[in-house]
Amino acid sequence: ALKENVVYDWDATTRLKQLKPARFNFIADAETTVDGFLAHEAQAVVPEAVGGTKDEVDDDGQAIMQGIDQSKLVPLLVKTIQELEARIVSLEAG
């Protein structure tokens, strides 16, 4: 087996609600608006999805951007949908 400590019952909705989607532009491209997350904020919630360090610079003083691997958010989104669906079914059942 390649995996261990597999858990299927975890609270994705609470975790997902901690993410703060934002609309912004990069300083180098003021004309283009982007919907996304600020990597350093997302890192506090989903550290496995974020690479790099906030405000890191290289030897020449140039910023090294953090990045978010959006695909690592997919399991969190799917689990949240499942949790919300179960909640809807429960509420509709009365």
Role assignments for model-derived ranges:
Residues 1-94:
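Intramolecular chaperone/auto-protease modules of tailspike-like proteins
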